[in-house]
Amino acid sequence: MHASGARFPNILLLTGISLLAVALIGSAQAAPSGHVIYEGSFQPKDLNWQTDAQGLVLPTFPGTRSLAQPGLPSVPVRELLLLVPTGMDVTSVQVEALATHAEKSLQTVPLALPHVSDDGTQISTATMKNSGGVFPAQWGEYTGSHFWRGYQLVSVSVYPLRELQEGGVTSLEFLDGFAVRAQMQPRSGSADVAQRERLVPGEPADNAAVLERLVANPEQVSGYMRQNGVAVEVDKGDFQPSAAPSLMGSGVSYLIITSNSLATEFQRLADFKTSQGIPTVVVTKEDITANFRNGADIQETIRLYIRDAYQLWGVSYVLLGGDSDVLPPRYVENSYYPSIGSTWIPTDLYFACLDGNWNRNGNSQFGEPAVGADLGDACDFAEEVFVGRAAVSTLTQAGVFVDKVIAYESTAAGAGWPDRVLFAAEVLFPSDFHPGDSISLDGAQFADQQVNDLIIPCTDMQYMRMYETDQLYPWDAPLTLAALVDTLDNGRYGIVNQIGHGYYYNMSVGNANFMTGDADALVNGDHTFLIFALNCASGAFDNSCLLERFVQNPNGGAICALGSVRAAFPYNSNNYQQEFFSLLYCQNEFRVGRTMALSRLPFIGSTANNYVDRWTFENYTLLGDPTLAVWTSSPDALTLGAPAGLGLGNNVVPVSVSNLGSPVPGALVCLQMPGEDYEFGVTNASGQVSFNFLPGRAGDAVLTVTGENLAQATLTIPVTPATPYLTLTSMGITDNGSLGSSGNGNGVIEAGETVALTPSLEETGGGALSSLSGT
């Protein structure tokens, strides 16, 4: 697809969020209006007709997915995200056809089948209609305006083919070229967008890199007017955050929210992460509710705190340190499933998406979708922070969680198990499959897609395909309960992808169910795995569900788990699963919470309406540490270069990081001496980083290096005094008339006063001083 875009004028930044309006784009006959923000084209040579898992022969183009509206033609759709100025309201969007032609293919577009959850429930409702003999009626659809970390994104669906019916004859029309036009006006008044007030070093460039691969008009990223925050000057010293989110003190990258009863264990995790160069703070819900502004309930109070932490501290990652009985989730009602009735979904997405308040209409229900002209609660599902949950209720469980994270990230160089992927895929439909039956959907299809499209081209990882049958796809071993338990117990796999049926307490593995008791009994030790479960409800953390039992296991099990809290719709869920693993294997996104959040962004345009993508967004959750660095190969051994020792006072500390003689760029390096100084940074292309380090007493500084597929390396650097060294410990202020002073005697320096300063000094170098003089 060819694309070009026009430059936007610089617009002053206004905080705000456009309403998530979902409006049908003007008809093709309407006179085009608005500013062209994007032009694109489709090439006839890129049209392919492929048979999908349901046996439908569908038209496809690169970068599209089928419009899965039951009972309507399954035309392809390309979902565009376009960057537009953040200070503007988007009032309308049109897709203008620039060139079309009659498609000569004799193929007809089949009708989409009902959506089917993995429990067999069918959803036949559609949000679009086929009327007037042309489908879709327009070449495109405006699906909403969203904010991600202060960047405004417009989502547009474009259809490269339309079906025409006239006189009983069906034909296809091909969209050769098109323009996206938007009418925008300066936003009046403020709107509710979370904005960075503290500058996070490196984040603007990092955000730009994400957007350049996400949006269809990446040329707009450079020079985009977005509030990055101010650089906060912090006094030299150890990590010293303020007591509550503010622009004072050290910045914070990782926020752990828990309860008073669990805080001591999570502080161990905070100390470990801080030593890696991820400055981390533990805050309890009791402290938040007692000392911070309260919302309508505890969930809103916690979200308000997270929003302040994002804006003022610079927080990017949040761990909800407690199960649903400790930190209650936000429940949202979704009427997409079942077709008659609705489902209450516990979603931690509420704590990650910080724009708006998820209750625009001010009633008792949060997270209501747009229905017709009613915009509902105008929820923006773009995640500003990357959230995970530690589903623990006791101090012992919290200790297990922390121990497992530390052990996983301390895996020795050369370990083989992180370099292997295990697939456990069964036939999804028919759900009562027996060997020899006709198969309408085999989970092995999704596994093979991942192997062929991602693992083989992007990694050197080994993989094991355990399938219920080899009727359609070759297996490496048959999937049975006994075989899966034995394989997991052996601890040979770092990533496990289960594709099949499931419920709160089980996942189906061909001939039997893998139950919570099986997860409890695993003994794979420190060889813990990431499990991504494409099944119904095994991630329902408001119950003692299967996925949380994997993570709670003290003798092995999983290091983290990703899955659905309620029903899952396999075809739709697979889009998100494939995108997650594409980011992990092919695009160097190795921190699990960030990877999960970014895997959802391409599909955000389909979330305003109460339909299958909104359902999937709300349902999938991460049970685990969101900062976890996921292994996708054997960890590399590191060689560190640093001074053999440091003196008291200011030191320039050059650090080099290499592997087998080659420099390692992008490694996170932290130098810390408790109570004295704390510095961290990332190595450049030459594998180097340098710190100004200011210890005030003798002792040891510790250098810690981590990164993508890098075995954690540490180096202790002694700090020894070369000469006596004085440290200022306090400064007395006298303004009461003594010592030549004049003032009001309150001990504060004020205008018009003459003050006497009395320093208190401590010799911290270990030497002897016979005299002291100063000027």
Question: What is the predicted role of each segment?
Answer:
Residues 1-9:
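N-terminal secretory signal peptides that target proteins for export/translocation
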Residues 14-23:
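Bacterial N-terminal signal peptides
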Residues 29-716:
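Cysteine-dependent hydrolase recognition
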Residues 140-141, 640-641, 741-745, 758:
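Short structured motifs
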Residues 629-637, 720-735:
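Proline/serine/threonine-rich low-complexity linkers at boundaries of modular beta-sandwich domains
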Residues 644-650, 737-740, 744-753:
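Short, solvent-exposed loop/linker segments at the N-terminal edge
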Residues 668-675, 762-775:
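Short acidic, flexible loop segments centered on an aromatic residue
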Residues 752-766:
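Short beta-strand elements of extracellular/lumenal beta-sandwich folds
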